């Protein structure tokens, strides 16, 4: 599943470091100086000091002031925003359903194709897992469920999620955007410990052997990363 996603609109905008931009959640307000983000609770939940990360964290904005219908932001890390870029709101518990309409269609497809495993993205608590299990149970299926831990709320509710899933994926890409990067190793180790405690599968993902897309041999750092995953009793790594 894709899980609860937030994205920019159809705009193409160049954001220069040090300049200011207004961010809006009303598509009627978007223009060359107002960037649209498709999250209706944007101005309700965010304010001065919060950050907005765009395009998988490549562009970073700091909120200076909440104007009610828009957020005045300073561009900390600039870049060019193309249509439908991913948006992260670190530290914010987003008010979106755990399973979207698109996810339900994908889950129906999974049932029709008799898949063995489904990975659930951006899990925040156990409720979404139980909802999907019930959906499968009503159809007489027992498809394995893997929880992707990708945000702070998922980390906070880690133990309750592990208890109701068949395994955990440490999705270090989005997780490393949503939380401080230096916390990643500790969180990965905690997840490994809890998976061992409850006898659940562990998958470590993101940037494993990424250099081999261009080079014939991995870097020493990648070898060490894989070795650490093995030492943590991972059942699989995802390239």
Predicted regions and their residues:
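Non-catalytic helical/linker scaffolds that mediate oligomerization, partner binding
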Residues: 1-239
